[in-house]
Amino acid sequence: MVKNHDPKNEMQDMLTPLDAEEAAKTKLRLDMREIPKSSIKPEHFHLMYLLEQHSPYFIDAELTELRDSFQIHYDINDNHTPFDNIKSFTKNEKLRYLLNIKNLEEVNRTRYTFVLAPDELFFTRDGLPIAKTRGLQNVVDPLPVSEAEFLTRYKALVICAFNEKQSFDALVEGNLELHKGTPFETKVIEAATLDLLTAFLDEQYQKQEQDYSQNYAYVRKVGHTVFKWVAIGMTTLSVLLIAFLAFLYFSVMKHNERIEKGYQAFVKEDYTQVLNTYDDLDGKKLDKEALYIYAKSYIQTNKQGLEKDKKENLLNNVTPNSNKDYLLYWMELGQGHLDEAINIATYLDDNDITKLALINKLNEIKNNGDLSNDKRSEETKKYNDKLQDILDKEKQVKDEKAKSEEEKAKAKDEKLKQQEENEKKQKEQAQKDKEKRQEAERKK
């Protein structure tokens, strides 16, 4: 039996695999970024690993170095909600997610850069914003976002979340001020500062929350049997809930009691007792005051065997007004969470505390009997390279400074020598002039 030749079917068969291939390429582009090495200065190559460091403001990523480029693979998964998905949320939930975008403004205080746009923005299950693409200031794109540009893009995102007919790019490129929308959108556009915009969004969110709590209730008609089982279930749930709340209450009380005990030990300058009391507390859940108490106590006990001058310098840096991440670093270091300590130190771009964390990490690897020889060598090389990069950079800065000072001293010596020669010549000339005058006097 001979099959009839159908050009339409043949074309369809050809298009299907092509469409699937194109879809796979599109997903790859979403999950991956490639940066040519030609776009980066060679002396900055060692900084590229910062693009895979964990940060609360960015999607986790993995950096791979190829011959001519760096590839970044993003871990985009079901826990990440794309910006476009929140458009279908209820108004109060939508406002909550949008209000949290203000947190990304904190990135401008770090060395990282990012793109604030719909296709670059995701949210965690808790509604916290995370950006996909990140760069490094003066190293790799994207360029830093100014306060004015951040505010403009923030407004455009808010409007697009409520008005799907609007184009984000068109609003950002100049149509924002010309946009005529709802009273809500007008208020968003009129906000002159980030604080005013977030205050307005928070006000709207609170109104929506109040409206939902006062005007909405879910009622379901059920038969007697269903009602009975629901009642039994609710009773059981109530008992479990009371038990849980009791556990939570006593757990919180115990937690607060330990915090207070640590504070009392700190006042008595019993720094070792402070460390023992806070030993297994989660630093990320502590307030700034508790972190300060731990950080100062840890440095005072000098667990790292620091020299006196170095110790005093660190104590001067640890104050109640210090950066919370800086204080958290000392708790992570003291509790042996060295990877977290290294991440925080790198994020803060502080060479001194980064070196300290790396040295501790190398000692941990050295003393870890569970590691095979190959794994120990691999890990040692990894962290040794990071430490050496910092030392080389510091040595370069130190050498350049010494060279500059040497050149200044040399120039100063040459100038002084020239002045002495000039003074000597002036004295010799003055002596010659004097002798000529005396000779002239004798001949008269």
Curated annotation (Swiss-Prot):
Keywords for the protein's UniProt record, in alphabetical order: Cell membrane, Coiled coil, Membrane, Transmembrane, Transmembrane helix, Virulence
Membrane side Cytoplasmic: residue ranges: 1-229
InterPro entries (UniProt xref): T7SS_EssB, T7SS_EssB_C
Ligase recorded as keyword: no
Lipid bilayer topology: Single-pass membrane protein
Pfam families: YukC
Region (Disordered): 366-444
Extracellular side: 251-444
TM region positions: 230-250
Claim: Metal-binding is one of the keywords in the record: no
Biased composition range(s): Basic and acidic residues: 372-444
Coiled-coil regions listed: 387-443
Main function: Component of the type VII secretion system (Ess). Required for the secretion of EsxA.
Sequence similarity: Belongs to the EssB family.
Protein name per Swiss-Prot or TrEMBL: Type VII secretion system protein EssB
Gene from which this protein is expressed: essB
